[in-house]
Amino acid sequence: MENEEIPEFLSPKEEIVYWRELSKRLKQSYQEARDELIEFQEGSRELEAELETQLVQAEQRNRDLLSDNQRLKCEVESLKEKLEHQYAQSYKQVSLLEDELARARSIKDQLHKYVRELEQANDDLERAKRATIVSLEDFEQRLNQAIERNAFLESELDEKESLLVSVQRLKDEARDLRQELAVRERQTDGTRKSAPSSPTLDCDKTDSAVQASLSLPATPVGKICDNSFTSPKGIPNGFGTTPLTPSARISALNIVGDLLRKVGALESKLAACRNFAKDQASRKSYTPVNLNSNSSSSVLNSSGVKYSHAGHTSFFDKGAVNGYEPPGVLGSRPPSPPGMLPLSV
């Protein structure tokens, strides 16, 4: 409106009308502006009150939020401390578990190594066990052979003792038969003196008996033993009342000759065994002795070998007449001289 140009008036009335209308327009605009101002003031007051209430609420909310923030900060600090403490504990626990894991792995490696060593030792022990079993079987076999040999030697020793007994008995019987022969010869000499016509017949009979005895084969040793045990019943001792028949006398002479030959063979056999035992004893006496314990053990072993058959010493006491002392049973069997009968016969 300020920029509006004032028109030119033709008359004062037109000017007055113009200014009146202008004033009316300005007054109306003023009224409108005033109303708007009043309305704006009222609206601004309401808005201010509302903003104040909102500000109060915002301040209250801000205070609440600040308190909540402070509380949350405290909680965060506490949680952070707890987290740090928990992290430290977990780190310590993890480090401890790692150490334990390292120790467990080292122990596991050691155990694996120990298991391998045990397996190797077990294999060695199994091989040693198999070798021991084989050696034990070999030892048992040798022990059984030694036991069998010992039993065989004991049986030979028993047979030898029985042979010594039978030889002594046969010696007694031979002595009795010699005495009986001497008595018979004296009787025959008396009968020859009383009857001079019969000597030729008796000489022929005795010559035929001697030739028959020389022509007969040698009696086996088993039969000799049987005859030696049965002779007291079948052969009279010269003091009985029953006289000997010529056939019985021939058989008795044959048995006596065989027995004398066997006794001589046995005596030579025993002498050879005695010489062999003396040689063995002399060889043992010349062996060097290194330790006292070895000497004592050898003495004990020799004494054990010598007295291992103490139950048979009575028969050897009887056989000691020939000067024979038997060697150890467990020792090696002496070789038989050529042309001699074995002791096991």
UniProtKB/Swiss-Prot annotation:
PTM annotation: Phosphorylated in mitosis.
Coiled coil regions, renumbered to chain: 19-190
Disulfide bonds: none
Pfam families: NUDE_C (PF04880)
Primary location class: cytoplasm
Biased composition (Basic and acidic residues): 182-192
Subcellular location(s) per record: Cytoplasm, Cytoskeleton; Cytoplasm, Cytoskeleton, Microtubule organizing center, Centrosome; Cytoplasm, Cytoskeleton, Spindle
Annotated keywords: Coiled coil, Cytoplasm, Cytoskeleton, Microtubule, Phosphoprotein, Transport
The protein's name in its UniProt record: Nuclear distribution protein nudE-like 1-A
